[in-house]
Amino acid sequence: MCGIAGFQGKGSREDAERMIARINYRGPDLQATTMLGNTGLAHARLSIIDLSHDADQPMSTPDGRLTIVFNGEIYNFRDLREGLMRTGHPFRTSSDTEVLLHLYAEHGEGMLPMLNGMWAFAIHDARDNSLFLARDRMGKKPLHHAQTSDAFVFGSELKAVLAHPGISPALDLHAVNEYLTF
């Protein structure tokens, strides 16, 4: 079990570090953060597939265009990797994380139906400063998010989201009323 957290908008590296520190037990092997303009990405790693430091996250493509934080396991990543290698994609790790980066580079959001597994991830594209989040169809890997007036915030657990200074843990009574009305 790994953990991811991050934001796009108002925030700092310290905010990303505080967010991932709240869920550091999800990844005892390494906690790391990166800032990409106004986007902060953080990862708590539990090494399973590729134990090398080359597979540490946040992970970027060699050209730095795409950066990912990923929690989960892609069961068919070896088959996907073979197909990508046939089309000229080079790999430096044996991790399923790197396969996701190359799949996104090749197919964009169209990659999702190709995935078999359990996952939650965020991919930042430096080309247009976009942030793409996805989780598996059944929601086995959690991915919580919140929108404020100046930031989009996400994390594997609510604790990480609430650690961002732009998020207030106050109860929104209007939202509760909407939820309970049927």
Which residue stretches match the model-derived regions?
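Cysteine-centered catalytic environments shared across enzyme families
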Residues: 1-182
